[in-house]
């Protein structure tokens, strides 16, 4: 007999161990089985499972389990990312906390050994947490982006791209983190709003040049008064960068400065003559319309400098201190100390014209927390523009599709405006760049040191000294190879032949560019076809109010704590049910508790079936059932199988979960089992046997359909129900997905039981909306019933009385006074409610509630009709108001219908 309640804490680890030990996570060995392949977005080896991981990996597991049950060779390939900067930071902090010497004092080799030690001891935490989530990955194929096989693939790709002129070394601006002293990607840059200022500086014109500057204007904006100036005003939020200025830009159509283009200013403090250039980047409507240009320390200025042929002067060290390119008094000064010194000098010497306080966005390192500097340095770059063209074409032609489709637009925008990809990082933990520097500026890019020395020997005719590049590759470089390097490339492995390209990628929108696009580029370039047929972009998980989760807000939900408290199945079902396309997930603990109750409902239904001897019967054929309710549940089961299958094939996760929830809770538990009780408690042995077998069969189908989403409770019920009836051939994880013929839907049974369900449901709704006490038993009068309705009434009178809590069901020529109308096909029902309620009080209550909703609708409509609100409010706040409006309108409509119905009562 089943226990009274399901205990996830004891069941989950036992079942997971059994699945893994049985080899169920490995793809079917049948060479004819169609592959279904997902590569996991590799979590950082430093990471722990957060709610975003829980969502992403739940959806991957749902698909993997579904396709495995459909007989495909399902492979979900797991692994972790070495996470260069994150891991190096963790180990450096641990060393510091333990009082050890720093990384640089320790030396590269010793430090990297320490990182490997840390990885061996602590690096497996997140994979164990994925097991807690029920992830059915093939752990025998687990990969790590720094394991030897993947490292060999990385070296080969780097060398081949270099020799194909698609990878090169260049001096360009990068995001520079002065604390970690490395270039970082845009994804590792966090924009923070800070209090700052625009300092307006007057740069004196050189060579005695002056010009007429407008100072008064008429109502049409035409200048009416001028003053002679021998300077031009520029504004900056970073005064220290002026020491690296090599130009001033004005818009070519700006009449104020047309005569100054080609002239020079003398840069204060430095004394350098720098030209005034015309460039569209300068905005005549902002500030003075003139912009100081520092090509080595601003991304926009770098472009202006390239177009105008301006020199790029780097004034910072790797620690963001001023270097020897600046006047001696500033050399070695911290950038922010220099800022104060320069402003003080400008004020003292009279060329500070104005200080304009402002709030502005400043880039910070997401891990270091320090202000990031645009920094001019030699780095390695991939020619992403060339590689992007086939990746664009693959999505344009439908070789790879995005779900939801609107994310294709984001993909196209990024790839059509792509810049060279900086792939080098000034770190020690990662794939060391396979490039060796030799005499006379020579560079040898090879897969091994031996090959580099051989190439140098061939070039110079003798052995020469080579030094390997100290830098490592951007973590995203190795991640870009993930779909094929994990399958054994560059070796021609059987896995690579069988499982590439993969089927579906499930990932977040924030890494479409950083990861998805780069996998597309690399996969097509090295494998000749796109790495996946479909990219499913999952939503962002927010809190119940729609706000982004963050530690500072205190609204973070830890999935491991939720799993401990409420069980893994409840967490998984919630995330699946809320994964509607094109909308974020508003998650609350109450919602998860609700889906835990769904699991309890299934467990209790199974206990009910067991207590009523609803046991699987060898050779039972559902097509032969005779009882209308059994024909009906058979048809409902057929429809649900089709609906869930279609939804998971798409995939449309919320539709699959919705169909499962409705069928299990409403159709099977609330209706079928209730309708079956009279038969199960009756004396008709044949009907009883058929109903028991049908209930057991339908429950088996439910377990199969629910398994991809709620694997633990379904596997436990599968195992426990195997104690009765024929033996199970396999564990549920390996069971065959149900395929049921459409002709099992019986139109006559569907119509008859559908009529009964709708009638009882309608009566229950009336009772609820009119506040009829649960203990009250009103009578139901039927008016205008035809022969079919009369026959149905005769067959189901007892069920109507019980399920609708009625005193009597009778026929009459007219509806009695004080009754509420009930739709019953061609007939009309009249529910006698007047004696059980205070009609006037109910009318007053409904009228008051309607007015309340009307007020809410007016209030929200006013807000949503205000352009200022729409422009200023956060997206989640606007969406929350739209949802409030929809809910209020639906509630008002329902109450108005109830009030209309009440009017007929009295």
UniProtKB/Swiss-Prot annotation:
The keyword Transmembrane helix does not apply. A motif ('KMSKS' region) lies at residues 548-552. GO terms for biological process: valyl-tRNA aminoacylation. ATP binds at residue 551. Its main location: cytoplasm. GO terms for cellular component: cytosol. A motif ('HIGH' region) lies at residues 43-53. Keywords: Aminoacyl-tRNA synthetase, ATP-binding, Coiled coil, Cytoplasm, Ligase, Nucleotide-binding, Protein biosynthesis. Residues 842-905 form a coiled coil. PROSITE patterns: AA_TRNA_LIGASE_I. Catalyzes the attachment of valine to tRNA(Val). As ValRS can inadvertently accommodate and process structurally similar amino acids such as threonine, to avoid such errors, it has a 'posttransfer' editing activity that hydrolyzes mischarged Thr-tRNA(Val) in a tRNA-dependent manner. Belongs to the class-I aminoacyl-tRNA synthetase family. ValS type 1 subfamily. This is Valine--tRNA ligase. It comes from Caulobacter vibrioides (strain ATCC 19089 / CIP 103742 / CB 15) (Caulobacter crescentus). The lineage of its organism: Bacteria, Pseudomonadati, Pseudomonadota, Alphaproteobacteria, Caulobacterales. The gene is valS.
